[in-house]
Amino acid sequence: MASSTEQILEIIRQLAAERDTFTSDDIRPLLTGDLTPRSIPSAVGKARRDGIIEEIDRVKSSIPERKGSLVGVFRRPGSTLATASSNSDLAQHPSAVVSSTAQEIIELRAYLERMGYLCGVEELASVLLMLSSRTWLILSGPSGTGKSSLIRHIASAVGGTLHDVQVKPNWISSEDSLGYFSETSQRFVPGVLSSALIESAKDTSERFHFVRLDEMNLAAPEYYLAEVLSAAETWRRGTAGRMESDPIQLPPMPEKVEAPYVALSDNVFLVGTVNVDETTRSLSSKVLDRASVYDLHHVDLFGLPAKNDDLQISPPAAPGLVKLLKDRPHSVSELDLPDGLVLEVGELLSQLNTYAQTLGGPIAYRQRDALLTLASLAEKHQITDILSRSAVIDIGIRACILPKWQGSTLAAVTALRGAIATILELDTQPAEISTEVARSEIPRAKYPRTAEKLASMLEQATNLGYFSAW
C-alpha cells in the first residue's frame, strides 16, 4: 500500500495538471480515508524536489484555524519533466520522455538523496549550468543549507577532485591566498589557492578540479582575489591544448627567485560559499559582475532523505553531465545560439536597463552574455527538459543581474517598482506598484523567480527604508 506521502503526491500531480496555480490549502479538501494534513508538507517538498511543481510565492492561509500563517503558491513548471511528472504512468518512467542528460540529473539527485543530501532537480540543473557557463559560482543561503556539501557531492559524482580553501577573516591581500616570498628561505611559498591551481595544471587527465572557497566573504574577495579576477578576463589555448586564462600575477618577489606559473584552466571550477550575517562582508561589484550567485533558499524542514543501508553506494554514470562541464564557452562567438534567444534576452534586458543604473549599475555585455550562455547550453545539452528557456532566463536574471541591486533613496525605490512592472509585463506606472499588486501577479508571470525576489525587495524597502538582493 502506498504511503500517505505518495498518496498526497498523486493529489498534487492532479492539481498541477488541472490548475494554473494552487496552494496547500487546496490539497486539504481532497484528502480521503486516513490521510491527514500533517502529511501535506512532506509531500509538497518531495513534489518540488522531483520537479512536479515550483513554488512561486507565499500567501496567507484562507483556512480559519490557520488564519495568518503563510502557505506556498505552486504551479507546474513549463518543462517536459513537469508535464510527464503530472502523469502517474509517465512519472514512473521519466527516461521515456526526457533527454539522457536530463535523466542523469534526475538520477544524480536521487543519488544525493540516498547520500543524505536533499535538493531539487531545478537546483541541481541550475548549479550544473552555472558551473559550465561562468568562471565563478557563488552559493548563498542561510548557514546549514548544504552549500559546501552540494559541491562536494557533485565533484564526487563526476569523478572530480575537491580542493577546500578555508577563507580567514584576516586575509587582506593576495599573499594570504596565492602565497608570499619568504625572506628566510629566499623562495616563494605557495598559498592554498595557488597550490590548488598548480596541482590542477599538472593533472594531464581529464579530471575536473573544484576549488571551493568556504565562507569567502569572511574577508574582502576583491583584496585577496584581485589578481585571479583580472586573469580570468582573457582566455587562450595553452601549450597543453587546454584553454587557460592569462597568468595570475603573484605577489612581488626578487627577480632571481623562480616563481611558479599559475593560471586558471578549463578543468578548474571556482566555487565560493557565502553567509550573510554580522560577521561577513558584502561582495563588491567587481566580484558580482564576474559570478553567478545562486541562492539555496529552499529549506524543506519536513523532508527526510530515504534510508540507505548500502554504505558503498557509487554515484551513477553521468557522461552527459561530464560533456556539459567540458563545454565551457568563453565568448558568445563560440555559442550556437537558438532561434529568437538574442531578441528575447536583448529586449528584456534593454527594458530592465532603464532602471538598472539607479539600482546598481547598467546591464552590460558581460551580464547579457551570461544569460545567452546559460540558455544556449541548456538547449544544446537538452536540459530544457527540466528547465524551460524562460525558466533558464529567469534563473539567470536572478543569479547574474539582481545580486548588485540595492538602494534606499526614493529614486531607487521608484526604479525597483519600474523593474517589477517590466518583469510582470504590467502596463502601469511605477508608483502604482505595491507589494500586494506584485505578488498577485506572480502566478501569471513569465519570470516568477525574479518577480518574487523583486517583490521581497520592495517589501523590505517598505518596512525598513532600504532594500538589497541579499
Feature annotation, model-predicted:
Residues 1-14:
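Short alpha-helical segments that sit at the start of domains
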Residues 34-46:
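Short amphipathic alpha-helical interaction segments
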Residues 49-58:
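A short, conserved structural fragment
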Residues 59-82:
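Short, cationic-aromatic polyanion-contact patches
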Residues 86-323:
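AAA+ P-loop NTPase catalytic core and its hallmark functional loops
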Residues 102, 310-470:
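Alpha-helical lid/collar subdomain of P-loop NTPases
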